[in-house]
Each structure stands twice: as structure tokens, then as C-alpha cells.
A protein has these predicted regions:
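Short amphipathic alpha-helix that is part of the acyltransferase structural core
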Residues: 2-60, 168, 188-189, 193-196, ...
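A short, internal acetyl-CoA/4′-phosphopantetheine-binding micro-motif in the GNAT/acyltransferase core
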Residues: 86-95, 125
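Conserved catalytic-core motifs of GNAT/GCN5-like acyltransferases
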Residues: 122-123, 141-155, 238
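Non-catalytic, surface beta->alpha helical segment in thiol-disulfide oxidoreductase systems
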Residues: 234-254
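Conserved GNAT acetyl-CoA-binding A-motif
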Residues: 111-129
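Conserved beta-strand in the GNAT
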Residues: 56, 60-71, 84, 89
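A conserved beta-turn-beta hairpin within the catalytic core of GNAT-like acetyltransferases
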Residues: 72-85, 95, 173
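Conserved acetyl-CoA-binding loop-helix of GNAT-fold acetyltransferases
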Residues: 90, 96-111
């Protein structure tokens, strides 16, 4: 990694003008297009005009932060004048060079410059693999402000106000047998995950439905916490972690 350069020289923010040519950090392809990346690119094209921010290391590496105004964030969280962090991820060569801190600080600086009341993100009592590192967030002052089952809404308030989970998100039950997955296109990994899970469930006679969350309104009314994926088994909410076939098989064997 380059040393001694200014942060704004190392980070790049996606815009409608550069979205088509910039890589999306967590899945980087040089020749063939990845369907999940292209689905996310289309999704981002609709979100950027709403104030959605995707900021990344200006290199072919995985180091980025993604956040949006809470009012237009596709999550069942309510509040005024907050930013919501979907993802903060650094891996591979950039790890250990302070880019996670730089990315987080860029978000917090952005929030203050825009006069926001604070910044929030989804966490859990036990760290989930597909959520941003909440211990890292705690170093900046993020703390739990609401709870839904084992999940927590973490917030850093600048003015003493706080967001909350939507009432529906605390329900965490639905009337459906087998596997139910709610998903959107925010994460590039989801496209292939859904395709493979559909095939697995069909091939193993597992009742399953996959519900594409395709609007802000639908996301705000979901019956569980959600960042970009939520799984139920026999009507009971399980996790925001993306599942594979063997994980579903274990659920059936319970």
C-alpha cells in the first residue's frame, strides 16, 4: 500500500458519472461481468441520487464503506436525520494499514458536515459474519440504542436523539413452512447465493420461498431486522447471515 498520501487521494466515492467503470470492491472481475455485481450496479444507480454513498480505496482491493440517509436506507429502522452504515469491509492487502479507520472517519466527517444527528448500523449480541465489526465501531462511540431479539441497533448520536427499529422488525415471525429468505441487491454476493439455494432446496425437496425486497417501502415494513438478507425457518426468524445448502440441511435435521 502507498504510504504518506492524503486520505482524499487514496479514497474514491462513486458517482453517477463513474459508477459504470469503477469496481465495487468486494467482488472484482477483470474480464467477465459478475451478475451480482451488475445487479448491485443497477441498484446503486437508483440510490446515488438519494444521497447513498459508496466510498472505496482507489485501488483494485477490497476496502470500502457504504452508507445512506436513514430515511432512504433499505432497512426496517426509523429515525430522523441519521446516516445508516450498510457495510464497512477491509480485507486482503489493505488490512492493517488503517483504511478501516479512515473510511469510518470519512463517514463521520460527512455526517457532521451535513448537520446529521448521528450515524447508526446493525449489530448483534454476538458478532455476525455478514455485519460490520461492531467492536471496531465501539471504538468510535457506537453503542446499542434498541434491540430486536439477539440483534441490536448501534448508534453514535451527535445531539442526544436516537433511531429505533420499526415495530414490524421486532415481530420476527411469519406464517410460512420451511425456508423463507428476504433479500435485496445491496450485496453482490446475494445473486449467486439465492440461485444456489433455490437449486439446493428444489433438489432436496425443501419448501422454500425467496422474496425480493424491491422497494424502500417494502424494506421498512419487513417482519425482522434486515441489512440485505434475512432468513426464516418454519416461520421463525433465524439470521441476517447468508446461508448455503449445508446450513439449510442442518436446520431441517433439527
Amino acid at each position: 500500500m502507498r504510504e504518506g498520501t492524503e486520505m482524499d487521494e487514496e479514497l474514491i466515492t462513486l458517482t453517477p458519472e463513474n459508477l459504470a467503470r469503477e469496481h465495487l470492491a468486494c467482488i472484482i472481475r477483470t474480464r467477465t461481468a459478475h451478475p451480482g455485481v451488475e445487479a448491485k450496479r443497477v441498484w446503486l444507480a437508483g440510490r446515488l441520487p438519494e444521497g447513498h454513498v459508496f466510498r472505496k480505496l482507489n485501488a483494485r482491493e477490497c476496502a470500502f464503506i457504504e452508507y445512506a440517509p436513514l430515511e432512504t436506507a433499505w432497512v426496517p429502522v426509523l429515525g430522523k436525520n441519521y446516516l445508516y452504515i450498510y457495510c464497512l469491509w477491509v480485507q486482503g492487502a489493505p488490512k492493517g494499514h488503517g483504511f478501516g479507520r479512515r473510511l469510518m472517519e470519512s463517514c463521520l466527517s460527512d455526517a457532521r458536515a451535513k448537520g446529521k444527528s448521528g450515524v447508526c448500523m446493525l449489530g448483534a449480541k454476538k458478532q455476525k459474519a455478514w455485519l460490520a465489526d461492531q467492536r471496531f465501531a465501539g471504538k468510535f462511540g457506537f453503542a446499542p440504542v434498541d434491540q430486536a431479539g439477539e440483534y441490536e441497533l448501534l448508534a453514535l448520536s451527535f445531539d442526544g436523539t436516537y433511531p429505533r427499529f420499526a415495530p414490524e422488525a421486532k415481530r420476527q415471525t411469519i406464517d410460512a413452512p420451511g425456508l423463507t429468505v428476504y433479500y435485496d441487491d445491496q450485496c453482490p454476493y446475494i445473486f449467486e447465493r439465492v440461485r444456489k439455494l433455490r437449486e439446493y432446496c428444489a433438489g432436496h425437496d425443501i419448501p422454500a420461498q425467496f422474496i425480493h425486497v424491491d422497494s424502500l417501502e417494502a424494506a421498512k415494513r419487513l417482519p425482522c431486522v434486515f441489512n440485505n438478507w434475512a432468513a426464516f425457518w418454519d416461520g421463525r426468524f433465524l439470521t441476517v447471515n447468508q446461508l448455503d445448502g449445508p446450513a439449510v440441511e442442518k436446520l431441517r435435521e433439527r
